[in-house]
Swiss-Prot record:
Entry similarity comment: Belongs to the ATPase A chain family.
Keyword annotations: ATP synthesis, Cell inner membrane, Cell membrane, CF(0), Hydrogen ion transport, Ion transport, Membrane, Transmembrane, Transmembrane helix, Transport
Lineage: Bacteria, Pseudomonadati, Pseudomonadota, Alphaproteobacteria, Rickettsiales
Identification of the protein by name: ATP synthase subunit a
InterPro entries: ATP_synth_F0_asu, ATP_synth_F0_asu_AS, ATP_synth_F0_asu_bact/mt, F0_ATP_A_sf
Subunit field text: F-type ATPases have 2 components, CF(1) - the catalytic core - and CF(0) - the membrane proton channel. CF(1) has five subunits: alpha(3), beta(3), gamma(1), delta(1), epsilon(1). CF(0) has three main subunits: a(1), b(2) and c(9-12). The alpha and beta chains form an alternating ring which encloses part of the gamma chain. CF(1) is attached to CF(0) by a central stalk formed by the gamma and epsilon chains, while a peripheral stalk is formed by the delta and b chains.
The species this protein was found in: Ehrlichia canis (strain Jake)
Pfam families: ATP-synt_A
TM region positions: 29-49, 54-74, 89-109, 114-134, 144-164, 182-202, 208-228
GO cellular component terms given for this protein: plasma membrane; proton-transporting ATP synthase complex
GO MF terms held by the record: proton-transporting ATP synthase activity, rotational mechanism
Locations listed in the record: Cell inner membrane
Location, primary (coarse class): membrane
Gene: atpB
């Protein structure tokens, strides 16, 4: 029986750990690839910035390009006052992009295809933005729940709707990212399996098509990290700027 395209998303235990308060904390393939993503990002930045030079080398150029891209994204969505949160936004972008890209490699696993992982990342953003909002605006941050010009009789309903929308942010962020990663990797698996079954793997046209598809998936992996980053900056804008 042929393997399902969804088998690539199965959580597999690598080694067991004692339960904590009844919760299973076994080290899984998802844990492994999140650790690999973290190490990869740290090494990439360390190697790129270890020997800074006026004329940057290849890795330094990439690190500086990503940094400048993050700065530009923050400035365009939050403003100069948002630049103090570059470490947060940079880390989120790099971690998600690396997790997405590692899943494309042979024998790789896409940690961001699981809602538990993407929801955890989204909650980091949600909690951080909420804390930053109260830090910058104090109690006035709650104005985000009541749009200006709202009639008094409509205020209770609007507060309820806006509160629901605000609390739904991490849910929408996590579902969007996980769903896109599942869809992209599943399509590649299905088409690759079809090519192998038809015994046309070595013919030029299917090979070219698969290469193009993988290239597109790399683009989508980076694009999803970018979209998540932009939405994070939009939420930061709500927290930093008074309404």
């Amino acid at each position: 029986m042929s393997a399902s395209p969804l088998d690539q998303f199965k959580i597999l235990t690598i080694f067991k750990l004692p339960n904590i308060a009844g919760y299973n904390i076994d080290f899984t393939n998802a844990s492994l690839f999140m650790v690999l993503s973290t190490i990869s990002v740290a090494l990439f930045c360390y190697i790129g910035l270890k020997k800074e030079s006026i004329i940057p080398n290849g890795i330094q150029s990439i690190v500086e390009f990503i940094y400048e891209f993050i700065v530009s994204t923050i400035e365009s969505n939050v403003g100069k006052e948002g630049l103090q949160y570059i470490p947060l936004v940079f880390t989120i972008f790099m971690f998600i992009a690396t997790c997405n890209l590692l899943g494309i490699l042979p024998l790789g696993f896409t940690a961001t295809s699981h809602i538990a992982v993407t929801f955890a990342i989204s909650m980091v953003v949600f909690v951080s933005v909420t804390i930053i909002g109260f830090k910058h605006q104090g109690i006035h941050f709650l104005r985000i729940l009541l749009p200006q010009g709202t009639p008094g009789w409509l205020a209770p309903m609007m507060v309820f709707i806006e509160l629901f929308a605000y609390c739904a942010r991490p849910v929408s962020l996590s579902i969007r990212l996980a769903a896109n990663m599942i869809a992209g990797h599943t399509i590649i698996k299905v088409i690759a399996g079809f090519v192998v079954k038809m015994n046309i793997f070595l013919t030029p046209l299917p090979m070219i098509f698969i290469i193009i598809l993988i290239g597109f998936e790399i683009f989508v992996a980076i694009l999803q990290a970018y979209i998540f980053t932009v939405l994070t900056c939009v939420y930061l804008s709500d927290a930093v700027k008074e309404h």
